[in-house]
Amino acid sequence: HWIGGWIWYYIQKANRENFLYDLYDIDGGNIQYTHYYPGDYYTWHIDGDISTTFKPEIKPGTGENLRDDQTFHKGECVRKLSFSLQLSDAKDYRGGEVEFINSAGERYFAPKQKGTLIVFDSRTKHRVRTVKSGLRKSLVGWVVGPRWR
């Protein structure tokens, strides 16, 4: 789908300008649609750490599902980057902010403007605060790469 290509383009741009991580592709080629109604939230968590390893279900760099053992990527992978694409207009809901906290305890909020793509290190602690009214919609996913060196 075109949206996956668009997201991948900006993930690579963010990676070049901010992280310089070795990346394969979006985890499993999957992007999740999420929605939060009033009262919904997601508590503090991280999406990956140095021990999160698994075999991807996609051919690196293509997004194609792998069917045969000859083309299956044999190495272990880790989630390195996470992303969220804001689908709702900020005026359509209250609350639901994506909040980050760094190791010094400083907190930051992601922009809520519709169309904003947030790309961040998967080891960053974050949450979605409680939606107070309206509906918050987003696309979220994770980017995998080889084990950390």
Where are these regions (language model features)?
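Fe(II)/2-oxoglutarate oxygenase catalytic core
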Residues: 1-117, 123-149
